[in-house]
Amino acid sequence: MRLLFLVLLVLLGLIQYPLWLGKGGWFKVWDLQRQVAEQRETNDGLRARNTALEAEVRDLATGVGAVEERARSELGMMREGEVFVHILPPGTPLPSDNSTPQASALSKPRPPATPPRR
């Protein structure tokens, strides 16, 4: 009787091995489910990013307003006749008087460039 019990216990162990540790066992399935969940999160984030980029491309292709907004914010461009006003945060020291001569030096017209002699 004891021998029969041991044989059945060994057979049970042999049957359980592929279920838990085999090629398609539970540990492998759990790991694959975790990988699928991570990939779904990544895909959702990329899908949202693609939607935002598509909207931006659509705006840039159809409207002048988006191009103008981008030129103003990223390149600092202004329309002719506009005045740039820079509001300093509280506690920021005011620019010194030394900045005025630099601004006037920049506004002086340059002499025309002469071509190099050959």
Curated annotation (Swiss-Prot):
GO terms for biological process: FtsZ-dependent cytokinesis. The chain crosses the membrane at residues 4-21. It is found in: Cell inner membrane. Residues 88-118 are annotated as: Disordered. It comes from the Bacteria. Its main location: membrane. Residues 109-118 have a biased composition (Pro residues). Residues 28-62 form a coiled coil. It is a single-pass type II membrane protein. GO terms for cellular component: cell division site; cell septum; plasma membrane. Belongs to the FtsB family. NCBIfam families: PRK00888.1 (NF002058). Part of a complex composed of FtsB, FtsL and FtsQ. This is Cell division protein FtsB. It comes from Bordetella pertussis (strain Tohama I / ATCC BAA-589 / NCTC 13251). The lineage of its organism: Bacteria, Pseudomonadati, Pseudomonadota, Betaproteobacteria, Burkholderiales.
